[in-house]
């Protein structure tokens, strides 16, 4: 079978970049200095950044490294010319943004365009993706397609889609934000996605569907890889009942839970686990009963108003961590409230957690979902291998426009981060707390989210705190959400990690076109 018709497989990549070493396309950069664009004084849109965005788009279309390596990429001041399926003479053109659009973005103006399909999709996809929503690309109506066929051999993109992919995945808009909530977080209401009503759509992954359609139009013999839903469920162990706190005892008494009340009273005995610690075992077992995997994220922060301050080296906690290890359940990290924007505090807590969890690859998320662009850099400095913080506390949805794990681009450093981002989509307290949804509406909202993940072959991610099981309505809702997630494939983050951190093509020398 020829590379052009081979069914694409998940790319394999080497340690510090994006593209697979076998998939180094021919790169021609014509007058590379002219190909660099700027948004304000600090953000440079370089040829390597555009190649990164092109790969992120291509892999979301199901493009294999074998197919990608046959392409020729020519980058010039006016845009990127992509020769795909070269034996057939097929070409795709991605224009660079006009200077006036870059000036708009420099003024923090964020125009949003709506685009249509090249070819009408099937009704199931059409229901989920009626059009393409394209931020940072100028304004237009949905009558103009995202990709326009100028002949049977050439297709042109009608916006600077590579810039859009780059800015959305890198969270550029958060770098210029001036308003934050009382925890220093970028709130959903400040995002262009919330303001324009597309926070619950994985727009970057939807561009992959459009690009897949373009490739099929140019070469009907080509087929993308099958898209399958995967799931990664996790539990933030904010509270484990150690050290003993009277308010926990009072909480169980008020709820009328005799079992948990006595567990809290006798939790100091050697063989009795406090109710919150026991809940770690319980929530893992509940999740596994639906044939789904869990991960538990532990803390090592000192006591504070926002941190319970337990010691992960406590013998009872170690006993649960050992049990998780024996059960094949991942244990990860949850750096405390004060580690946000504090790399030194972060390093101290990670070092403590490594003493308990071991020296292997570790991932997790920030406590309180406190995240900013520097978080990627700080986690990278600590040797952490994946982050799963990127979600709004106050609204479910696709903060990064994607449900497909990816290697983030660091705009400030003009390079990819040496870690994987596994975007978080749903948190327990978001549904019943911040959004004030009832159980039925919560299930409906998550079901829509899962349907969109399935359509693009993404990873459905959700965090449910261990002690949430103490509350009947949270326990009831969790089991209902597990039921609609049941059947999703396991997300193998270690395999994804080894394939994602590959040999970056922008580090290789490029031939200069004439």
Language-model regions, residue ranges each:
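Catalytic domains of cell-wall/extracellular-matrix polysaccharide-remodeling enzymes
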Residues: 64-65, 74-78, 337-416, 462, ...
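A subset of signal/propeptide-processing and intrinsically disordered low-complexity segments
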Residues: 7-11, 329, 382, 389-392
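Metal-dependent polysaccharide deacetylase catalytic core of the NodB/CE4 family, i.e.
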Residues: 239, 243, 263-264, 281-371, ...
